[in-house]
Amino acid sequence: MLMVISPAKTLDYQTPPAVDQYSQPDLLDHSAELIDVLRQKSPLDIAKLMDISDALANLNVGRYADWQRPFTQNNAKQAVYAFMGDVYEGLDASTLGRPAIGYLQERLRILSGLYGVLRPLDLMQAYRLEMGTRLANGRGKNLYEFWGETVTAKLNEQLEALGQRTLVNLASDEYFKSVKRKALNAAIVTPVFQDRKNGQYKIISFYAKRARGLMARWAAERGVADPDQLRGFDSEGYAFDASASDELTWVFRRDRE
C-alpha cells in the first residue's frame, strides 16, 4: 500500500525539524527546468499567473532566485516538516516517533508542482507552484503536460519496491490529475470524509483535508500494510460506512450535530 497527499501553500522554515535524517528529491533535474522558466517571470507576471498579491509574488520571485543545488540542511528542510496547512496539521509529523516516520518515508508520497513527487524526508527549498498553474514550459502549456508520465513512473517504481498493487489517494483532484490512472500499476482506493451538517452528510473542505492527514498518521502509528485495515480508521470520531462505500471509494462519516 502506497499513499499520496497534496502539498500545502503555507510553509514553515523557522521551526527546527523533529529529526536530522533526510533524503534528496529524485526529480531535481526536472525541478531545475521549471525554476529556469519561473526566473524569467517578473513579480507582476507571477502575481497574474498565480492570482496572488504583489507581496506574495515578490516573495516567490525571491525564492526562485535563491533556489540552488545542492540541497543541504542549511538551505532546505524535510518536506513533511516544511509544509503546513490542514492536511499537515492532521498528520502532525513532528509528534510522530522514528518508526512512524520511517513508515511514512516508505509508504507516503507528496505530489508537488515543482518537485513532482517527494518522500516525507526529502529536503525541499521553499516555493509556491500549484499543480494547476498554467505555466507554459518546454514540454507543454501547463504542469500536467510538463510532468507527463514522470510522476506516475515514480509511483510505479515505489509500488514495485513494496511489492504491492494498491494506491490510496489522499490527494486533492488538482494534484491527483498529475497521475496517469491507466499507466498506474495499481488499484486506486479513494477515501472520502463526510461530516453531518443540517441533517445531511457532506464533504466539508477543512475537515476533509485534516482527515486525510489523520488517516496517514493513523496508518503510520499502526504500521498498516494491507489497505483493508484502513477501514478501521476511527480518528476524531470518523467511522467507515460500508453502505455508502463501494470497492474503490471508501466513505468515512462523522456526526458532529
From Swiss-Prot:
InterPro entries: YaaA. GO terms for biological process: response to hydroperoxide. One of its GO terms (cellular component) is cytosol. Signal peptide: none annotated. It comes from the Bacteria. PANTHER family: PEROXIDE STRESS RESISTANCE PROTEIN YAAA, PEROXIDE STRESS RESPONSE PROTEIN YAAA. Belongs to the UPF0246 family. HAMAP family: UPF0246. This is UPF0246 protein CV_1250.
